[in-house]
Amino acid sequence: MAMTTEVKDELSRLVVKSVSARRAEVTSLLRFAGGLHIVAGRVVVEAEVDLGSIARRLRKDIFDLYGYSAVVHVLSASGIRKNTRYVLRVANDGEALARQTGLFDMRGRPVRGLPAQVVGGSIGDAEAAWRGAFLAHGSLTEPGRSSALEVSCPGPEAALALVGAARRLGVGAKAREVRGADRVVVRDGEAIGALLTRMGAQDTRLVWEERRMRREVRATANRLANFDDANLRRSARAAVAAAARVERALEILGDTVPDHLASAGKLRVEHRQVSLEELGRLADPPMTKDAVAGRIRRLLSMADRKAKVEGIPDTESAVTPDLLEDA
């Protein structure tokens, strides 16, 4: 998950001047990384993230934008927890923060998707919503056939809100349920790059694009190499088959074969792997590849006619599966 960490590290250091965008990011981050809990009759807002820089950014924005203090607890890696996690908690002013960020609606009920002010906000707010969601639960895989930018969502409503925000940014994203969990996925390489830039991870996009291009060049080279290998194998098998047929033709015709056809046939048998053009140069006197091909074709035709009349195996009988397998 190295690329994921690179994206999150860059986004956590991004300077955002728009107050509206900062609010949208905080709201989205709390929605996708956190939860609302009732502790001793009070609403507590929590968010769990995987980088200390994200927790510090969120704590600072909550204080700067809303004036509430948050406490960050560090959960060290141990047992089933592979990595250190950071839990941000707003206890004393949890309900007020939930209302102001839009996590509660006007009647005090939890909002299941994203608040209307974020969904219907500016393009900068849509970018911020994606930034917050990715900082909360996003992942980016290495470029390849299964590369994807993905966000785990707290529910289908939040997933649909994120898909809508992506659409406003000109990015095609799909909401999916995988093993009972809601996710939003972007798979197209160009779309992933565009979304990284929109969120503010331009440096990481350049690294990702470079790796993507390297992989595509390597894949193209491999395909061409495989194509060339296949062509060489086909050519080798065709040459072996032709030599075997010519050999059988000379056996069938014996002393009755015309000299000019016999010389062309013997060249093919003696030089099984060379091209018709090279066979022509080896002939005495030299001749064109079309002339060589024509003589070999007449030799095979003459032998096959004689084999048919005499009821013996023709030249094709010399081309066995074992012969081609060894070619």
Curated annotation (Swiss-Prot):
DNA-binding region per UniProt: 275-308
Keyword Plastid: no
UniProt signal peptide: none
One Pfam match: WhiA_N
Keyword match DNA-binding: yes
A GO MF label: DNA binding
One of the protein's GO biological processes: cell division
Family matches, as InterPro entries: Homing_endonucl (IPR027434), Sporu_reg_WhiA_N_dom (IPR018478), Sporulation_regulator_WhiA (IPR003802), Sporulation_regulator_WhiA_C (IPR023054), WhiA_LAGLIDADG_dom (IPR039518)
Alphabetically ordered keywords of this record: Cell cycle, Cell division, DNA-binding
Task of the protein: Involved in cell division and chromosome segregation.
Family membership noted in the UniProt record: Belongs to the WhiA family.
Protein name: Probable cell division protein WhiA
Lineage: Bacteria, Bacillati, Actinomycetota, Actinomycetes, Mycobacteriales
